[in-house]
């Protein structure tokens, strides 16, 4: 490929320790195998991240994120733009983008997350514009709006503004990418657009990092049957999921398995999440250096999300770790796995409790599901396989990559 790639990110891709950074880091590496990549991202510079990014990218500019949510909401009231877009509006970021465009022969702009579209030049015969929406964010806010009240009204306004923004961005992008066929279809339905090019670029999982290894059992895990949830614990869908599970599902499980414990594993737990630790059988770990020892210790991993967009990395990682997973329909959406063989899908509190107990009480079934889950990930979810279409999406024939 003649020319460079400009990669725009709303959050630093390294370390790849949460859903969006896992995807952006792997895509960044794949793009760097095709052409020189220049990264402009929000985030603070630190030695480890700077070194890792410098190994992959031809140039790196990390712009501190200073705007607050309150400031973004105020700006949104004045501008009519979505608050989630205003949150990432920055003169310093725009200046960094302009500097890269002036200094290097940029042929492709890869915008990771909708908020970054505001920095892609408009009009003229500029670089190819690839918009990686990943999820349909407007519909996430539409889900939040169902809560009602003042926050529900605010989220309903944000959902409407963001959908208008997403529609306008897709109309000018050369291709818009989504993490699953379900997200792509949802966008086409809610946007009403038929002309813009859309495509699917699914997530994979690191099959070397997440595997059926044995790690020392965390002391806090104890010796009783362990049910584990992993995730960023200041993220509303995760907060909602663990709160519902701890209050509605775990008591049903403990009625029949009195010593069962539920571990909520992830950084930045809110006060509401920390308070769950006072409930019988609930462990709240806070940030841990590595989630794999907790996955290794688990008899069952759960993903009881009621609000979810895209593909859940937490489910892929658990399955790659050869763990039996009980997931909601929302959490399992977009994942190519067979219910009853490679994971269990359950929706109501009673159904989730029954599913977890069936695995706790039938070790042979659990072991068979663990093996099937790992085999499914090996067969269908390597990052190399999932990102194979990337070259064509940036306007490069895959035969050119091979050459």
Can you describe what each PLM-predicted range is?
Residues 1-61, 102-104:
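N-terminal subdomain of nucleotide-sugar transferases
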Residues 10, 67-87, 127-167, 185, ...:
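Acceptor-binding helix/loop patch of EC 2.4 sugar-transfer enzymes
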Residues 130-131, 138, 155-189, 193-212, ...:
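Donor nucleotide-sugar binding/catalytic pocket of nucleotide-sugar-dependent glycosyltransferases
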Residues 171, 189, 195-297:
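Conserved catalytic-core segment of nucleotide-activated headgroup transferases in glycan assembly
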Residues 174, 281, 287, 296-310, ...:
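Acidic donor-binding loop of glycosyltransferase active sites
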Residues 314-318, 324-328:
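Short hydrophobic beta-strand element within catalytic cores of glycosyltransferases
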Residues 343-350, 358-363:
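Conserved acidic donor-binding segment of nucleotide-sugar-dependent glycosyltransferases
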Residues 365-380, 389:
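A short, well-ordered alpha-helix in the C-terminal region of glycosyltransferases
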